[in-house]
């Protein structure tokens, strides 16, 4: 009798994806984040589903329904805090996953990379609409400020904003539709993840050396299942540490006050994972320019394959590119810090310098470093 794992139509797909998948023998812990992101997504969908059972998407009861979840629902506090901090873990893994892709040249698998960028945008949209749901001060004003950015679009901007709001301000209609979006988007993300994996398995995984690994492959199970399980233990440890000891460390104190359209918080800022983009948005005094820079800061990832000038795929043996990569990482950390600071000197100028540096590094310096490294590696005799 033939093995069911290799013959059954559904088991066969699972087998080719997680068990008998040929994987490079030298992929490091940086390749763990794909599976961690998958687990984060499952966890967010499950905790979100249980939250949705008790949440009411109405401006008069939304805030108190979240309080009710934390006070009266069995383990509601745990589900809510796992969901909120799970989003932070999701973005942490996402940023590390993208960083790995840039460092090791994974973006040269263009279809996989492009679907990945679409996934990033979808996850960001999901997180944004989700942040509005508790209907606290920062939820309300964050929604007002970010949706208002669309009014910078010439001619149709104002109409577009009112269309998204469902009225003349962020109100009941906005909250209801944002809840609908927040519920449907994770399932769209799941579908996109399957497409992402489909394209990845067309080519196989990249590896730290950037050299074609076809001559040296090992089965995914048991080697990488056990390795991914170790990564999962680490991630769950950090998540539980956050959730059980400092559940509100990454949230804004203003969001513990119910939304009040008559009282603006002193500093409107998004969650930490959007601060880098928010800093770029704020660093340009012009509204439309800021919105375009905000979009460009994410969409520039789509240009990564076009900006690759090196003869080598990975940065593993390219010290100049490595240096620029870590400068870019530090630059993003500076932008994240600036995004959380008030709009005053010296933060304004630091934000502007960091924003210019961000685009300069990706568009000019890193491609130039690739060309210079090619030149240095040419035989001189």
From Swiss-Prot:
Localization per record: Mitochondrion inner membrane
Gene3D superfamilies: Cytochrome Bc1 Complex, Chain C (1.20.810.10)
Keyword Transmembrane: yes
Keywords noted in UniProt: Electron transport, Heme, Iron, Membrane, Metal-binding, Mitochondrion, Mitochondrion inner membrane, Respiratory chain, Transmembrane, Transmembrane helix, Transport, Ubiquinone
Main location: mitochondrion
InterPro entries membership: Cyt_b/b6_C, Cyt_b/b6_C_sf, Cyt_b/b6_N, Cytb/b6-like_sf, Cytochrome_b, Cytochrome_b_C_euk/bac, Cytochrome_b_N_euk/bac, Di-haem_cyt_TM
Binding site for a ubiquinone: 201
Protein name as annotated: Cytochrome b
Organism: Trichosurus caninus (Mountain brushtail possum)
